[in-house]
Amino acid sequence: MWNEFKKFAFKGNVIDLAVGVVIGAAFGKIVSSLVKDIITPLLGMVLGGVDFTDLKITFGKSSIMYGNFIQTIFDFLIIAAAIFMFVKVFNKLTSKREEEKEEEIPEPTKEEELLGEIRDLLKQQNSSKDRA
């Protein structure tokens, strides 16, 4: 059972996934900072000094902090756009590699052509013997 777990845990895909999760978490922090510290203040300046984090609806002692929700939506949209662009570039690169592989199929050499002809002749001889 331990050996099976080691095979699973140290497979390339699992390690790649773990690295992706760690990088994704770090990327999420960067995007959150970008939205919170740069984009939201710029939007606030354009919209007349509005600070999105201060936007709220108060009911007695309770508040609905919809400004934070708007900021989280910006986070999501930027992360989604970045992932979309990454996947688009990745797909374009992999499709180019596949096209190059298809183009790289070499023409058969004279030896290969002759071997193919010999194979075909042997098949004909064997099939004519089977008929007789």
Swiss-Prot record:
Membrane-protein topology: Multi-pass membrane protein
Domain of life: Bacteria
Keyword tags: Cell membrane, Ion channel, Ion transport, Membrane, Transmembrane, Transmembrane helix, Transport
A GO CC term assigned to this protein in UniProt: plasma membrane
Keyword Ion transport: yes
GO molecular function, one term: mechanosensitive monoatomic ion channel activity
TM annotation in the entry: 14-34, 67-87
Family: Belongs to the MscL family.
Subunit structure: Homopentamer.
NCBIfam families assigned: mscL, PRK00567.1-4, PRK13955.1
Matches recorded under PANTHER family: LARGE-CONDUCTANCE MECHANOSENSITIVE CHANNEL, MECHANOSENSITIVE CHANNEL MSCL
Function: Channel that opens in response to stretch forces in the membrane lipid bilayer. May participate in the regulation of osmotic pressure changes within the cell.
Name of the protein: Large-conductance mechanosensitive channel
Native organism: Bacillus anthracis
Source lineage: Bacteria, Bacillati, Bacillota, Bacilli, Bacillales
